[in-house]
Curated annotation (Swiss-Prot):
Keywords (A to Z) from UniProt: Cell inner membrane, Cell membrane, Membrane, Protein transport, Transmembrane, Transmembrane helix, Transport
Record PROSITE patterns: T2SP_F (PS00874)
Topology in membrane: Multi-pass membrane protein
UniProt source species: Vibrio cholerae serotype O1 (strain ATCC 39315 / El Tor Inaba N16961)
Single GO BP term: protein secretion by the type II secretion system
Protein name: Toxin coregulated pilus biosynthesis protein E
Record lineage: Bacteria, Pseudomonadati, Pseudomonadota, Gammaproteobacteria, Vibrionales
Localisation: Cell inner membrane
GO cellular component labels: plasma membrane
Entry similarity comment: Belongs to the GSP F family.
Predominant cellular place of this UniProt entry's protein: membrane
TM ranges: 108-131, 146-161, 312-333
Gene: tcpE
Function according to Swiss-Prot or TrEMBL: Probably involved in cholera toxin receptor (GM1) interaction in order to bring the cells within close proximity of the ganglioside for efficient toxin delivery.
Length: 340
C-alpha cells in the first residue's frame, strides 16, 4: 500500500482524536470511520482503513497497523504516544504539527507570489516596448545612433523576447535548488556564524527550532526521557538539523545542563534560559509547548515582514522600469528632434 496522502491523514487523525476523546475504543473508531466514509472518501483511503483494521485483529498495536501507511516520523510519534497511554493527545499533536508546517509553507510561498508576478510583468513590459514600440523609430534613426539608455532598454527587451526570460527562469530554478541543498546539508561554524543570520537560512533555522520544540513537548508529555527524545527527533531528518541534535546529545553525555547542552545555535538565548529554569519542574513539557507556540507566532511575523519587504522591492523595481522606459522614449524623441 502507498502512504496515505496528507489530506486523508489529517482527516483520519482528526476523527480518531474526536472518537477516542468520546471513549470509543480504537478498533470501533476505525470501523465507524470506514463505514461512514464509504461513498464520501477516496476508495484507496477506505482500503487503507480496512488494512489498518485487519492488522489490528492480529496485533492490537496501532503503531504496527500504521507502519508503511504513514511517514516513519509519524509512526515513531504514534508509537511513543501509544506506549505512554496518551494516544489521543499524541495524535492531536502530530496533526497540529502537520497543519502548522503546511501553514508556514503556504505563507512562505505566498510571500514570493507578488514579487514573482511583478518580475514577470516587468519583463513583459520591457519586451513589449522593445518589440512593438521602438522598432518604429529604426527607419528614422539607426539604433547605433540612439541614446545609450534607449539602446540598453531596446537590447534587453529583444533579448527577453528571443529567450532570455527562459534563461532567467532556469537560473532562478537552479539558484533555489542550490539554496535548498545548502539549507539541508551545510553545517559547521560558517553555517552557524554567518549563513544562519541571512535569509532564507534564518527562516529554515526558525522553522526547525519551532518543530523541535513542538516535537520535544509531545515526547516529554509522553514521559520520554529528553535524550531518547533527541534520538526520535533525529530520525530521518536533514544533515544540518542532525548535526545540531548530535551536538546536543554529546553535550548531555558530558553532563552539561540544559542551557549549555542545547546551546548549538539552533535555539535562541531566551529559549535556552527558559528551558534551564523549568527543566526540573513537572510541567516542563508544557513550557516546551509554550515556547513552540511563541516561536511559531514569531515565525509568522517574520514571514509577514519578509513578504512586505519583498512586495516593496518588487514595486520599486517595476516603478524604476517604467521610469527607465519613459526616460528611454524621451531621450530618443529628443535625439530625433535634434537630428532633423
Amino acid at each position: 500500500m502507498k502512504i496515505i496522502s496528507k489530506k486523508y491523514r489529517l482527516e483520519l487523525y482528526s476523527m480518531l482524536v474526536d472518537l477516542l476523546n468520546d471513549n470509543i475504543p480504537l478498533y470501533d473508531a476505525l470501523n465507524k470511520i470506514q463505514n461512514e466514509g464509504v461513498g464520501i472518501y477516496d476508495k484507496n483511503f477506505i482500503k487503507s482503513i480496512e488494512l489498518i483494521k485487519d492488522r489490528m485483529k492480529s496485533n492490537s498495536s496501532l503503531t504496527d497497523a500504521l507502519t508503511g501507511l504513514i511517514p516513519d516520523k509519524e509512526v515513531l510519534m504514534i508509537n511513543v504516544a501509544e506506549n505512554s497511554g496518551k494516544i489521543s493527545s499524541g495524535i492531536a499533536a502530530i496533526r497540529k504539527n502537520i497543519i502548522d508546517a503546511d501553514e508556514i509553507k503556504s505563507k512562505a510561498i505566498s510571500s514570493m507570489i507578488t514579487p514573482s508576478v511583478m518580475l514577470i510583468v516587468t519583463m513583459v513590459v520591457i519586451a513589449g516596448y522593445s518589440v512593438k514600440v521602438f522598432p518604429t523609430f529604426e527607419s528614422v534613426l539607426p539604433v547605433s545612433r540612439w541614446p545609450g539608455v534607449t539602446q540598453a532598454l531596446y537590447n534587453l527587451g529583444f533579448s527577453l523576447y528571443e529567450g532570455l526570460w527562459i534563461k532567467v527562469l532556469i537560473f532562478v530554478a537552479i539558484f533555489i535548488t542550490i539554496l535548498v541543498f545548502m539549507s539541508k546539508n551545510i553545517t559547521g561554524n560558517f553555517r552557524d556564524g554567518f549563513l544562519d543570520k541571512l535569509p532564507p537560512f534564518n527562516f529554515v533555522k526558525h522553522i526547525a527550532a519551532t518543530e523541535f520544540l513542538a516535537n520535544m513537548s509531545m515526547l516529554l508529555d509522553s514521559r520520554v526521557p529528553f535524550k531518547e527524545g533527541l534520538d526520535i527527533v533525529d530520525h530521518k531528518t536533514t544533515r544540518w538539523l542532525s548535526s545540531h541534535l548530535q551536538r546536543m546529545k554529546a553535550n548531555m553525555q558530558e553532563g552539561l545542563d540544559y542551557k549549555q547542552a542545547l546551546d548549538t545555535n539552533l535555539l535562541d538565548k531566551k529559549m535556552l534560559l527558559t528551558m534551564a529554569v523549568y527543566s526540573e519542574l513537572p510541567n516542563f513539557s508544557d513550557v516546551m509547548q509554550k515556547l513552540a507556540i511563541e516561536a511559531n507566532i514569531n515565525l509568522h511575523k517574520k514571514i509577514a515582514t519578509l513578504a512586505g519587504v519583498m512586495k516593496n522591492i518588487s514595486l520599486i523595481t517595476l516603478a524604476l522600469s517604467v521610469i527607465w522606459i519613459f526616460g528611454a522614449i524621451f531621450s530618443l524623441v529628443d535625439k530625433l528632434s535634434s537630428s532633423l
